[in-house]
Amino acid sequence: MGLSVVILAAGKGSRMNSNKPKVLQTLAAKTLIEHVVSSVEKLNPDNIVVVTGHLKEQVEDALQGRNITFVYQQQQLGTGHAVLQALPYLKEQKVLILYGDVPLISTEVLENLVDTTNYDDLGVLTAFVENPQGLGRIVRDKFGAVTEIVEEKDANDIQRQIKEINTGIYCVHKNLLQKWLPEIKANNVQKEYYLTDIITFAKADHVSINVTHPINEFEILGVNDRTQLASLERVWQRNVAEKIMAKGVSIADPNRFDVRGNLDVGKDCWIDINVIIKGNVKLGNNVVIGANCILKNCIIEDNVRIKSNSMVDGSIIREGAIVGPFARVRPECDVKEGAVIGNFVEAKKTILGKGSKASHLTYLGDSEIGANCNIGAGVITCNYDGVNKHKTVIGDYAFIGSDSQLIAPVNIGQGATVGAGSTIVKDVPADNLAISRARQRHIDTWQRSVKKTDK
């Protein structure tokens, strides 16, 4: 089955009050038009044509690297005029026409429209909605056949009562478009060339009109302002949350959970409120994610606990490990089985060995820490000399006392102990105690200063 796709994306979207085109507003961290393109790409069309207009360079940059032909509509003269600009770039086959600001349209709905529309038919996707205000109405004759689509600005009082609306999504052969598009006239209030006029031409030419409907009403909702954008964001997120819960994951409040990428989940996980997923994230079984956590491009293995207000980015947290609360795991970390990254601990480009613990107030950067180590409160691996980063290596079973600074590059041997408050600048041999601090003195003649008082 041959198929071409036309996506109309020339609109300015003035109600957005934005410096970028409407189709480049984001929903779930993807632009509106990227959502649409992703849905149609799954149909494996022969070509995709995007009709641009306002700030066309921005739209082209956003879709760079995809197999798309861009066509510029210099004057905004309506949807019929927009499709006419794309006509020379279409193959002699079925053409699917849709909009770049309808982000939740599913591949399944589009596929049904294409599959049920014969080569000599006109396929129209319509929907029944409770509030059709602002939308084009589907007018039918007494036999139920579609006769025309009337835009609200051109509709009479009776037509405005109609609940069946035009979604603006069509499937029609290029040969019919070549005949009909030049015949469209701007005989309307807006003085624009409406694509909806092809319904009238189809009736006149005795072309069958195939009508299909979406699975869910939200799939055909467009975005014209930021209020509608926020509303569709919640619809999208709720839909994603329900799919995740169906896989065996408990979400404390689906209305306070955001996926801005892809989430692969195991079973019996628990996700608390205000958790944000970014990029590609994988959760194992029995994972617990506390409130207000952000997970980005990471792997969380079985039985891990990510406590509240923690961030994990570009890292792997191994089975049974604990992160947080208030912890930050930056890219290229590997937190091994049963290890602990505790409260107010930051780690970057660090391996924390199996069973090792950094429980509080610590910075671990460019570090390789062995198994069963204890990293005390306030420990800092000083990895930056002002120009280059250097590595700290800590052997198995080492004990690093609180408030110690390890000046990289430095090696702490297996089983070594660093006394609290030390500044370590040289390698520490295995099983040695290293202390580097001033000797404690008691000055019995010292007197505390007394606050002066005005006389």
UniProtKB/Swiss-Prot annotation:
Coiled coil: none annotated. Its EC number is 2.7.7.23, 2.3.1.157. Pfam families: Hexapep (PF00132), NTP_transf_3 (PF12804). The active site is at H360 (proton acceptor). Binds 1 Mg(2+) ion per subunit. Pathway: Nucleotide-sugar biosynthesis; UDP-N-acetyl-alpha-D-glucosamine biosynthesis; N-acetyl-alpha-D-glucosamine 1-phosphate from alpha-D-glucosamine 6-phosphate (route II): step 2/2; Nucleotide-sugar biosynthesis; UDP-N-acetyl-alpha-D-glucosamine biosynthesis; UDP-N-acetyl-alpha-D-glucosamine from N-acetyl-alpha-D-glucosamine 1-phosphate: step 1/1; Bacterial outer membrane biogenesis; LPS lipid A biosynthesis. One of its GO terms (molecular function) is glucosamine-1-phosphate N-acetyltransferase activity. One of its GO terms (cellular component) is membrane. It is an enzyme of class 2 (transferase). Residues 227-247 are annotated as: Linker. GO terms for biological process: cell morphogenesis; cell wall organization; lipid A biosynthetic process; peptidoglycan biosynthetic process; regulation of cell shape; UDP-N-acetylglucosamine biosynthetic process. PROSITE patterns: HEXAPEP_TRANSFERASES. UDP-N-acetyl-alpha-D-glucosamine binds at residues 8-11, 22, 73, 78-79, 99-101, 136, 151, 166, 224, 330, 348, 363, 374. It is found in: Cytoplasm. Acetyl-CoA binds at A377, N383, Y384, S402, A420, R437. Residues 1-226 are annotated as: Pyrophosphorylase. Homotrimer. This is Bifunctional protein GlmU. It comes from Francisella tularensis subsp. holarctica (strain OSU18). The lineage of its organism: Bacteria, Pseudomonadati, Pseudomonadota, Gammaproteobacteria, Thiotrichales. The gene is glmU.
